[in-house]
Amino acid sequence: MTKSAELRQKDVAGLEAEIKSLQKAHFGLRMQKATQQLGNTATLKATRRDIARAKTILAEKQAAK
């Protein structure tokens, strides 16, 4: 789980890279769930919320410009 304070320290390019990596991780987890290989399904929810948190902070930084 990514903390908001850690995300706020990153610049716009860093946030975009973080979002991209989180989306790849989320896709992998969805594929594991579809093939019934995922043991802890709560990680899907946590990853989805991390993506939303990063996108929110990215939008705040872009609006501040």
From Swiss-Prot:
Disulfides per UniProt: none
Keywords tagged on the record: Ribonucleoprotein, Ribosomal protein
CDD domains: Ribosomal_L29_HIP
UniProt GO molecular function: structural constituent of ribosome
Gene3D superfamilies per UniProt: 1.10.287.310
A Gene Ontology cellular-component term: ribonucleoprotein complex
Statement: the UniProt record of this protein carries the keyword Ribonucleoprotein: yes
GO BP annotations listed: translation
Residues spanning the signal sequence: none
A Pfam family hit: Ribosomal_L29
InterPro entries linked to this entry: Ribosomal_uL29 (IPR001854), Ribosomal_uL29_CS (IPR018254), Ribosomal_uL29_sf (IPR036049)
Family the entry assigns: Belongs to the universal ribosomal protein uL29 family.
Protein name per its UniProtKB record: Large ribosomal subunit protein uL29
Organism whose genome encodes this protein: Acidovorax ebreus (strain TPSY) (Diaphorobacter sp. (strain TPSY))
